[in-house]
Structure formats: structure tokens, C-alpha cells
């Protein structure tokens, strides 16, 4: 889908940002590539449920994506609408979900600056999530400043939209706790105007890559994208890593660490059937080809309605653009309301 320039939404009278009767949830993604099954299991299925239970905001965090893709802005730009299309295909409803483009809400950047004064460099350096990411990216002592402080930007996002609930995995808990610390410090120092968010801890284990590696990633070539065809899914599944010691169907095999069974745990709607397959595989008598063919059927069953919705929205690209522009306008109104409260609490000039 070609990218259309997204203008910063024209401000109207801000809508009140009082604590909603239902929880307000903020979640989102960095638009650096197409979404895949890891996103579906880890967050998208939960978001589809949450949009009926909460006031759901989904952030296309293109500014955060630039902290480690600053030399590839075109990639980030092109993926904004691509990821929005993935959202709609996965089942997010424009009438229930507010989709916001981060770079089109300048209030987020201003709030980030105020929050930077409330956290120390040493505290940021101790964040285990950031430490792990710095090591993974091999930055050493050459960490871009924008990347180093992105947890503060995340805190500003959460506070600006008044989120009371934030879905996170175990690895993201330190990030959310840092947000809570910043919010508490702001409220104690100035005035209690910001909501302190709570964590909704994901119970879904992270899907491994098709090659058995810990992370599924399109850039690593070990992912099944939400937009993959049935034939592409079949080809990728047949090439999946399994137990290297399971050479013949009659051999006992290992289920633990076998991504085929991890995927079945995540997507097969019949746990009893999965358990029976595991028992048979462990005992010997179940070949990799047979269990992979079953996984192909399961995954294509999961992806079939997603493909149908994708085709509908691909025929109506204006609907995808409206999802983003109207959501961003709504998001900016909420962020402006919060920023106004922040400025008054800080007694800034003119407030």
C-alpha cells in the first residue's frame, strides 16, 4: 500500500480526559515491518478482545522506531499504513479502537522533555530491558541518546493518553515500573493529575522463530507474516526446525523446545488433541511431516478470516487511511487535554 502524507490533525476543543468508566488501555507497535504470528499470539488476539472490554488506544510508534532506524526513515514511513492494515485484518474495529500515529501528536514530544527531568541517567542505565537491548544491538558505548531514553518517551505516551492498563510481557515489566515511578514523582512534585497505570501481564509465551531461535523476526527470515498465503504458510511450516534427534517416525521425540508444538499450543483450539499428539511424539510413532501438516491446517484456519478482511481493506485503502487519521485526531485531543493539565500543574508561563 503506497504511503499517503499524514497531516498533523487540526485541533478542536479537547474532549475531557477524565478517568473513563471502563479501563483505558494503551498498546502498540513500532512500524518497522509487517506483523507476524508472534504479534498475533502475543498481542493482537488480546487487543481484539480488549476493544470490547476497554477503551483501546493503539499507538503506531514511528518516533520510537526511528531511535534505531534513524538511517531508514523510508522503511518506517512505509510501514505505518502497512501495520494499520495488519491491525484491521486481525480484527481491530475502527468503531472500537483508536489508532494513533506517534509522530503526528507533538504533545507527546513535549511531555517527554518534562519527564526527562524526573529520571536520572544512572536509573535509565540500570533498566534491564534497555541493557539487554543495547547488548543485543552491539552498541557498546555508542548508544544513540534517543534509543537510551526511549523508556521515558514510552512513559509520556502512556501518561498522555491517560492509560490505566498496559498489556506487557515479563520482559517489559521494568519499563512499565519506570513509567509508574515517573508518574508518581510528577504527581508528588506538582499535582496529582496523571493516572498511574497498572500492568496486564501476558500469559502467552513468546513464539520462537521457525528456525528454533528465541525471536521471530521478518528480518531474520524466520517468521510467518499475517499476510502470507496458504501456500507460503505450508512451505514455511514444512521447513520448520524440530527435534534433530527425531530421524524416523518411530523414534521418540522431544516436545520441549520444539517450535512445532509451541505453535500448536498457541493456535490449536483443541488442547486435548495437542496433548495427544505430544504423547504420541514422545513415545514414537508420529513423524514430523504428519504433525507439520496438522500445524499447516491449524494456521491456515486461523489466518483464513484475517486474509478475508485483508482483501476487503486492500480494495478500500481510504478506509485504512481513515482508521489512522481519525484515530490520530482523537488521540491528539486526549493528549492535548493531558498536556494542558501538566502545564498548569507545573505552573508554566501562560498557565
Curated annotation (Swiss-Prot):
CDD domains: TrpRS_core (cd00806). Pfam families: tRNA-synt_1b. GO terms for biological process: tryptophanyl-tRNA aminoacylation. Residues 9-24 have a biased composition (Low complexity). One of its GO terms (cellular component) is cytoplasm. Its EC number is 6.1.1.2. A motif ('KMSKS' region) lies at residues 215-219. PROSITE patterns: AA_TRNA_LIGASE_I. It catalyses: tRNA(Trp) + L-tryptophan + ATP = L-tryptophyl-tRNA(Trp) + AMP + diphosphate + H(+). A motif ('HIGH' region) lies at residues 31-39. Keywords: Aminoacyl-tRNA synthetase, ATP-binding, Ligase, Nucleotide-binding, Protein biosynthesis. InterPro entries: aa-tRNA-synth_I_CS (IPR001412), aa-tRNA-synth_Ic (IPR002305), Rossmann-like_a/b/a_fold (IPR014729), Trp-tRNA-ligase (IPR002306), Trp-tRNA_synthetase (IPR050203). ATP binds at residue 218. It comes from the Bacteria. Induction: The level of expression increases 2.2-fold, 5 hours after exposure to radiation, and returns to near a base line 5 hours later. Residues 1-24 are annotated as: Disordered. PANTHER family: TRYPTOPHAN--TRNA LIGASE, MITOCHONDRIAL. NCBIfam families: trpS (TIGR00233). Homodimer. Forms a complex with nos; one homodimer of trpS2 binds one homodimer of nos. Catalyzes the formation of 5'adenyl-Trp and tRNA(Trp) but with 5-fold less activity than TrpRS. Increases the solubility of the nitric oxide synthase oxygenase (nos), as well as its affinity for substrate L-arginine and its nitric-oxide synthase activity. The complex between trpS2 and nos catalyzes the regioselective nitration of tryptophan at the 4-position. This protein may not be involved in protein biosynthesis. This is Tryptophan--tRNA ligase 2.
